[in-house]
């Protein structure tokens, strides 16, 4: 399991599913399945998978200081872009005389939660301003936990520990999903929400992390034909399950399928090397984090303008919104801009 370029292509696929969730109404009236839920699952599980791949044997300090230091190093890479999108939405609201539904108190509360990236912890605020940045609340908490996660599995015979941990985590997630999504249970109604809560999303990350530790021992050499057949079959099965069981399943089985799908992407010599491991998709995967942060603001602020300019050509509006988002992400991913943000501003 040495070449993981195709996983960047999968990362872009995850983003594209999220983009479809937010802009797909331009193309069809009914969604084929919950694109957004599946897309963010790919993001969380893939993050755990790659952290395990990169750091499973690393010497990582795991005290409180190290957790904050690691989290801070990650925060520096996206916080400025987060704040820019937040300010753009704030300006748009002020310019158009938007009346905040929760009044002044709610406005101040939600501004604070957005600036501090805590809005994922408070369910009523999860989609405020740049709605998609609830993900940043989750990933920041996960970054804080990473040093402890690495140490926990490194200090043990990790293959057996990982398998047991994976099974326990999956059963716990299945239980919580059933409680939340099927039974409507909520431990703190009005404050807690399952979908965007960072502690809940840590399960997705951990299943990706332990999934790598379990499956890395099964990545033996396969012929090109067998690898391609396995990859193609898994991708078809994944999307078929997304379509057929969209409303029947809770998220946990989809997480399991996502882990298996990611594993097939690591098989060398298969068709995914060309489909997802080409230079274009690798690059789009590299900028997917920036794409994620900017895309919904672009959709919300520009779709009406483009709709008028393009004479209600929905497909053209969809494609232009995607291109604009890519161009903006390219700018913020551009090395001089990244260095200015991380070395000059910070």
Describe every region a protein language model picked out.
Residues 56, 62, 180-186, 271-281:
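A cytosolic-side transmembrane-helix exit/cap motif
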Residues 144, 151, 208-219:
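Internal transmembrane alpha-helix with an interfacial aromatic "cap," most often the third helix
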Residues 1-179, 225, 287-288, 305-346:
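Membrane-cytosol interface segments of multi-pass membrane proteins
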């Amino acid at each position: 399991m040495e070449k993981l370029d195709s996983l960047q292509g999968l990362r872009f696929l995850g983003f594209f599913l999220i983009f479809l969730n937010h802009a797909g109404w331009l193309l069809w009236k009914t969604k084929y399945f919950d694109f957004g839920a599946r897309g963010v699952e790919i993001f969380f599980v893939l993050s755990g998978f790659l952290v395990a791949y990169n750091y499973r044997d690393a010497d990582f300090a795991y005290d409180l200081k190290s957790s904050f230091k690691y989290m801070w190093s990650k925060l520096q890479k996206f916080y400025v872009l987060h704040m820019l999108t937040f300010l753009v939405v704030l300006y748009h609201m002020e310019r158009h005389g938007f009346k905040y539904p929760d009044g002044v108190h709610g406005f101040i509360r939600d501004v604070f939660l957005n600036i501090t990236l805590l809005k994922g912890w408070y369910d009523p605020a999860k989609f405020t301003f740049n709605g998609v940045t609830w993900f940043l609340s989750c990933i920041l908490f996960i970054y804080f936990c990473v040093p402890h996660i690495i140490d926990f599995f490194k200090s043990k015979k990790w293959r057996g520990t990982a398998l047991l941990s994976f099974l326990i985590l999956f059963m716990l997630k299945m239980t919580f999903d059933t409680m939340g999504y099927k039974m409507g249970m909520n431990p703190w109604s009005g404050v807690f929400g399952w979908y965007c809560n960072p502690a809940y999303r840590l399960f997705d990350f951990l299943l990706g992390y332990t999934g790598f530790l379990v499956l890395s021992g099964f990545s033996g050499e396969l012929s090109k034909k067998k690898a391609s057949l396995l990859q193609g079959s898994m991708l078809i099965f994944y999307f078929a399950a997304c379509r057929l069981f969209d409303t029947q399943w809770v998220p946990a089985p989809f997480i399991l399928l996502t882990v298996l799908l990611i594993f097939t992407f690591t098989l060398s010599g298969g068709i995914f090397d060309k489909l997802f491991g080409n230079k274009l998709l690798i690059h789009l995967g590299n900028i997917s984090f920036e794409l994620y942060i900017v895309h919904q603001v672009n959709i919300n602020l520009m779709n009406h303008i483009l709709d008028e300019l393009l004479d209600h050509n929905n497909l053209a509006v969809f494609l232009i919104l995607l291109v604009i988002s890519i161009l903006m992400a390219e700018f913020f991913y551009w090395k001089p801009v990244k260095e200015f943000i991380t070395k000059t501003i910070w």
